[in-house]
A protein has these predicted regions:
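A short, hydrophobic beta-strand-centered structural micro-motif
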Residues: 67-77, 159, 172-208, 212-214, ...
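Short, well-ordered alpha-helical segments
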Residues: 18-62, 180, 238-249, 253, ...
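C-terminal soluble interaction/assembly domains
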Residues: 219-236, 245-249, 270-350
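Signal peptide-directed extracytoplasmic domains
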Residues: 51, 55-121, 131-137, 174
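Amphipathic beta-strand/beta-sheet edge segments enriched in Tyr/Trp
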Residues: 8, 14-17, 188-239, 322, ...
Length: 350
């Protein structure tokens, strides 16, 4: 696996800040084990990020060898001891190879990150409404989630301060005041707001925990109810478990909606135009030979040829992504041009 300092070409296929602390009989073995474990973990994170939550699809992809999809890794820091390896690394996975595996498995995925979405948790109990108070379990669970999540939907939370509390008081936020929600979205630079309510209801003989999640646009208009649940507080309800379960359900709904709206479209066009720079006829014939060996190309025809450049029309029997993957295995890169269906063939630079 090559070590590089460059930026990963596709952020969706990058995992950064991976902490390694592994032990083995030798320092070298500890390094091998640590990096292998980190690669498996990072690959799982990428798959969880780009595919719609689905246990079967996840298992299909994670059954593949993670190290075969690695483009490069970058070591931020490391300390190699006699029987221990401590490091922090970033791993970049090869987008074309992962896409190829997804296509072969017949799976759908997305790669586009969302603009910021504000999480706005509200907690209500007999003593009052809490939005900006610290050390409230409901509020803390959402803060922890916002800090740790690393999927395609990018969430944000407002950091409590005196000025914010005065401009966004708790009671109007509880009532979903449209202007207050819009002001909160503006303060966070968010395009949407997830209003997250949890409260204790003592109006019945058995108290209840009520949880509700609603999605609003940046103007404070309701878009959808994304979660709703009531639980009896009969002495058997664990608030930590209840909050985490509701949180997972709500986030799955939002993630699925984003994925469905931004599914990666496999380019299944019938033909593409490929241009390539050459220095001799030998180069030209070599390129044509390599292209003719790619499984996704059914036929090739010459469009133009000069002393320095050639152009070929390729009739495809598969997707452009499959052709790109096949060429990559031969040391070439097929780069999309400015015009639709136009590509440039280049030697990969290692």
């Amino acid at each position: 696996m090559p070590v590089q300092a460059e930026t990963c070409p596709s952020e969706a296929y990058s995992v950064t800040g991976i902490a390694i602390d592994s032990n083995a009989l030798t320092g070298t073995k500890a390094r091998e084990v640590g990096i292998a474990d980190a690669t498996e973990m990072a690959f799982a994170k990428v798959i969880d990020r780009i595919i719609v939550p689905d246990k079967v699809a996840r298992a299909t992809m994670l059954a593949l060898p993670a190290d075969s999809f690695v483009d490069f890794f970058h070591i931020t820091s490391e300390n190699a001891l006699a029987q221990r390896y401590i490091a922090e690394i970033d791993i970049c996975f090869d987008a074309a190879k992962v896409r190829g595996a997804l296509i072969s498995a017949g799976l759908q995925w997305a790669e586009l990150f969302s603009p910021p979405v504000l999480l706005l948790p509200v907690w209500q109990e007999p003593s009052g409404v809490r939005v900006w108070t610290r050390d409230i379990l409901w509020l803390n669970r959402w803060q922890d989630f916002s800090d740790k999540t690393d999927k395609l939907v990018r969430f944000a939370m407002l950091e409590p301060d005196v000025a914010l509390e005065r401009s966004l008081p708790a009671r109007p936020l509880l009532m979903r005041d449209k202007d207050m929600l819009a002001k909160a979205a503006q303060a966070a630079g968010a395009v949407q707001v997830v209003w997250l309510y949890a409260g204790l209801d003592y109006s019945n003989s058995v108290p209840e925990l009520i949880m509700l999640a609603e999605l609003y646009d940046a103007d404070g208009s309701l878009l959808a109810v994304v979660g709703q649940e009531q639980r009896s507080l009969n002495g058997q309800t664990n608030l930590h478990v209840a909050f985490d379960s509701f949180q997972e359900d709500v986030m799955n709904v939002i993630e699925q909606s984003w994925h469905s709206s931004n599914v990666y479209v496999v380019d299944n066009r019938d033909e593409i135009l490929i241009s390539v720079d050459i220095s001799s006829l030998t180069d030209w014939y070599d390129v044509r030979r390599k292209l003719s060996q790619i499984a996704g190309i059914a036929d090739l025809s010459v469009v133009s040829l000069t002393a320095k450049k050639g152009a070929l029309r390729a009739q495809l029997s598969g997707s452009v992504e499959a052709v790109q993957l096949g060429l990559q295995e031969q040391g070439y890169e097929l780069v999309s041009g400015t015009a639709s269906g136009h590509y440039a063939l280049q030697l990969e630079v290692n």
